[in-house]
Regions:
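Long, acidic (Asp/Glu-rich), low-complexity accessory segments flanking structured domains
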Residues: 1-38, 42, 51-81, 85-87, ...
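A motif-centric signal for short, conserved binding hotspots located
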Residues: 46
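Active-site-proximal loop/turn and secondary-structure-junction residues that shape catalytic pockets
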Residues: 49, 94, 127
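Catalytic cores of phosphodiester-bond-cleaving enzymes
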Residues: 67-115
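Structural recognition of alpha->loop->beta junctions
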Residues: 107-129
Length: 191
């Protein structure tokens, strides 16, 4: 199954300095509907919370525009048209390991699983950084990540610039995923 890594990073940065981070933090150019049209059925959403406890999308230090609940509602509508459940991987994007972020993430995961669980299958519930399991979703999903930051065959600059590895390896890796690894979710940058 095709999935997109850091699915919301196509969105515009929330802060002006986010524009400087794009070469290092952007992992998708296409919006969620375009990702769906490319065949993606799994979405990797990275969540953090503001001081008021409102969730937002982030990748590293870059916050991106987009309403978390609006995106989940849009995905719910897409599942009704597709007549199939989508998979959503949720990650707490908080490498600083703050306890208040962890508590908010647990509540968020519980709420969205109850509200959207009929339409989407949620999995993972980990915190980026130490990859500790924060929320134990019912569904367990094996994944492969064909992304430069985690790839053994990535060149040094491909580990910090997602587009470079995707440009060089996506075609071959997608063929491998289709031929050999089709029983797992395969996450890609720049589908």
């Amino acid at each position: 199954m095709l999935g997109t890594h850091n699915s919301m990073t196509y969105a515009k940065p929330y802060h002006w300095y986010g524009w400087l981070m794009i070469p290092f933090a952007r992992c998708q150019k296409k919006n969620l509907r375009e990702q769906l049209l490319e065949g993606a059925r799994c979405f990797d959403l990275r969540i953090r919370f503001d001081k008021d406890g409102t969730p937002y999308f982030a990748h590293g230090a870059m916050r991106v525009k987009g309403d978390v609940y609006g995106v989940l509602t849009d995905l719910k509508i897409q599942t009704m048209f597709l007549k199939e459940k989508l998979l959503v991987r949720l990650i707490l994007e908080d490498p600083k390991l703050r306890k208040e972020q962890e508590i908010l993430f647990i509540d968020f995961c519980n709420d969205i699983e109850n509200v959207f669980g009929e339409y989407m299958t949620f999995f993972e519930g980990r915190r980026k950084g130490d990859w500790a399991l924060i929320y134990n979703f019912k569904h367990k999903q094996p994944i492969n990540q064909f992304v430069g930051s985690m790839a053994e065959d990535a060149r040094w600059y491909e580990k910090i610039m997602p587009f470079a590895y995707a440009r060089r390896k996506n075609k071959a890796n997608m063929q491998l995923a289709t031929d050999v690894l089709k029983d797992k979710v395969n996450l890609f940058d720049f589908v």
